Amino acid sequence: DAREELALEAHNETHYCTTAMKISKIIATTTAQWNIMRGKKSVGYIKNLRDEPGVRVMAKPMGVVGCVMPSTNPIVTIAANGMMSIKCRNACIIAPHPSAKNVSKKTVDMVRKEIAALGAPADLIQVIEPEFCSVQATDEMLAQCDVNIATGGPGMVKAVYSCGRPGFGVGQGNCQEIICDDYEDLD
């Protein structure tokens, strides 16, 4: 199973978490991400604005998405960023953290194989090759991509926000979403 193979490799390369914890995170997070996106429109007409009659929300591809990866969670972040990019008809380039460059390459190669098996161009997702993985290569990618996403520490997020291109960042202590059906029961 690819999950076990990738989790073991991620643990051995990064020394973060246990292999079992990484397997659990791969299963839970990638499944949740897919379930959130499945069946939702991501391009074209999305909805009408309630408070602005006649105004419609339209979604369109942004182009090539540069994705800066963390060392702590390379597999799941690659999967999530890749799913979001491709679902919205974008391509993406993965910039691995240097301490997770080999498992990141392996993950992207597996995703590329599956994309090609579905009849789509494998080049919808690409990775900075391990031998070229560096801050300079990541900075060049950020400057060339149409929009960038960073997941990681403050330095990575700052690099995305400072590169002169639109960017989204999430780092330590940030949360992208909280979903709670009954918030009245929270302590």
Report residues per predicted region.
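Rossmann-like NAD(P) dinucleotide-binding subdomain of oxidoreductase/dehydrogenase enzymes
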Residues: 47-186
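N-terminal Rossmann-like NAD(P)+-binding subdomain of aldehyde/semialdehyde dehydrogenases
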Residues: 1-55
